[in-house]
């Protein structure tokens, strides 16, 4: 009696193993055409929902026209409880929630339009355009903490004369003489799209920006030009006063500049940077006080390496 139970269990395990082996098969090109991966993920402020995208290529094995990766917006409410939140032909990026959690926002280009910031209510309804920059695509964006403003990083303004030359056949690029600088804008969020978003003057080429949790400041990564040398060695953090739209401080770092984070109270910046111009990688943690030298951008503040305790 005691021997029968182990034998029965062994027989069941062997049967299950044989069944699994029978179902297993080599991966085929058709399988590759049907692969999907999770793209961006955003959690609602109250933690009740997760917005995410699934990235996939057209399934040419089923007759779909070949094309680029499509990102489908989905909303999850719990385990095994998720659904598509936009039509299949709307491929989005930059997914996040509005500060009050009532809307999922994303970037998308509608037909022949430039990429803009759109939103769709989480409780149902159609998507609508929230903010845009005329004649330029929005590359990234961020909400103000109170949800009243959207800050946008957009492409360079179109050079009509250069566009005319390109259409006539002159499409050469003059190295280091045709830098296309990104631009920073703020747009009011309301029932209608802000027709005249405000431009914020930032010197050089802006590559990234973050809004402080208190909504008073933003930190902007900017280099003199888009050239790779400047991106490596001359990029600096600019502290922006969101009320006046002016740069109040430039934080000097001695070498390469990596990730920048703002403290929860908005008082300090933490930065991964090099220790000097000869440091081949940004691997040292630096701290800088946001309030230091505030209002005097002509006297840049210095970021100090953070002393770490020995283990």
Annotate each language-model stretch with its function:
Residues 2-21:
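Gram-negative bacterial Sec-dependent N-terminal signal peptides
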Residues 30-71:
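Beta-strand-rich domains and repeat architectures in extracellular enzymes and scaffolds
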Residues 42-49, 94-103, 140-149, 209-217, ...:
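Blade-terminus and WD-like Trp-Asp/Gly-His loop motifs, strongest in beta-propeller folds
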Residues 54-72, 86-92, 107-118, 132-138, ...:
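A flexible loop/linker signature enriched in serine peptidases of the S9 family
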